[in-house]
Amino acid sequence: MIFDFLILIYLMHIEDLRNYVLSLPDVEETTPFGPDTLVYKINGKMFFLVGLDYETVQFNVKCDPDRAVELREEFPQSVLPGYHMNKKHWNTIVVDGVLSTRQLKEMIDHSYQLAGARYKKSK
């Protein structure tokens, strides 16, 4: 019973993140690494990845290198060097209750902008 409840909470977090990311203009959802990793792109560039096979919700976002270091120092257990990514430009964010929803959205928005969201797709 408790296990089912924890799975439900996990899925709610994933769905909330997914809904937020998909609410951003021109976002494409893909699964290039298999069904256990959702990858979101803007203008063909990845800016948000979330694994579906972890006990805790965690996701990767692009980040300005200087800001990435600051965040890792400020939140050492919630903001880690990007897992399987260029650690200078990517952070792994652990959704463990330390970071607020506002902070999570700011990190997603920053990544979205870094991936080139301000430029429209050429048609």
Regions found by a protein language model. Give the residues of each.
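Charge-dense, helix-prone N-terminal extensions
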Residues: 2-123
